[in-house]
A protein has these predicted regions:
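Alpha-helix capping and helix-loop boundary segments enriched in small/acidic/polar residues
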Residues: 118-122, 145, 149, 175-182, ...
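Secreted/periplasmic carbohydrate-active enzymes, especially glycoside hydrolases
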Residues: 1-152, 156-165, 187, 202-203, ...
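Active-site neighborhood of glycoside hydrolase catalytic domains
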Residues: 160, 177-246
């Protein structure tokens, strides 16, 4: 069985509107659920196939914002959004990482999304090519997006190929003043909102890469991330010994 909980956010006039959520399996079966804007849509699907490194099964969710018809007029779809997702569990214990209850030995690399002579603005096809190199040529099962959230196309490819992703808040070594930290916290929130539907993402980077310790600030980044996603653990990358874990 696969449990799900669908949260939505809207902007604009939505009084009287309702939601319709449709989940489609890879085999084409459909399940439709209706709900209200103020509450999450929850449910359980039977016979789901979990997302894993060996079998990265993806389901498709389409959510529609509907204004009910009046005076004999039909309902009207005001907006809709389609995303892919997967059913899986991730847990770190003393013995290591467990994906869907099975222990996984991580073999991964750090990845920058810049290319010689072209920089960062590369098409989706090259983002996918990098993911294929990581999985099929290098034999890796994990990647760290060092050290910033990367192209949605790269995460899509990791979802499809079965690559675990450690994605991080942007930054490198530097910690700034209070306005800088306020923006960094917003970056953390945006990272979670942008990436949390990707089943490949198993770890949030809540620390600026290679930065000095700042217990109060990193407590806030952890809280900001876990407020939006309590299901995934957080981590941080270090360059010096005897530093705090976060």
């Amino acid at each position: 069985e696969g449990d799900f909980r669908i949260y939505t956010a809207t902007v604009g006039e939505t009084v009287g509107c309702t939601l319709q959520a449709e989940i489609r399996s890879p085999a084409g079966s459909r399940a439709v659920y209706r709900g209200e804007l103020a509450l999450p849509i929850t449910g359980t699907l039977n016979g789901v196939h979990p997302w894993s490194i060996e079998h990265p099964t993806l389901y498709t969710l389409t959510v529609k914002l509907i204004r009910p018809g009046t005076s004999g007029l039909p309902d009207r779809v005001l907006d809709e959004k389609t995303v892919r997702f997967g059913f899986r569990t991730v847990q770190f214990v003393a013995g290591g990482l467990y994906l869907n209850g099975q222990r996984v030995v991580l073999r991964g690399i750090n990845r920058h999304q810049s290319y010689a002579y072209q920089g960062y603005a590369m098409p989706d096809s090259l983002q996918r090519l990098d993911a294929q190199f990581i999985k099929k040529d290098l034999g890796c099962n994990a990647v760290r997006t060092s050290h910033y959230p990367q192209s949605p196309a790269f995460l899509d490819a990791c979802d499809e190929l079965g690559i675990l992703v450690f994605t991080e808040m942007p930054g490198w070594q530097h910690l700034g003043d209070d306005p800088w930290k306020a923006q960094a916290l917003q970056n953390c929130r945006e990272m979670v909102c942008q990436c949390r539907n990707h089943p490949s993402v198993f770890l949030w980077g809540a620390r600026v890469n290679g930065s000095p310790d700042d217990e109060a600030f990193y407590k806030r980044t952890n809280e900001a991330i876990h407020r939006l996603d309590p299901t995934r653990p957080t981590a941080g990358a270090h360059i010096r010994r005897r530093e705090q874990l976060l």
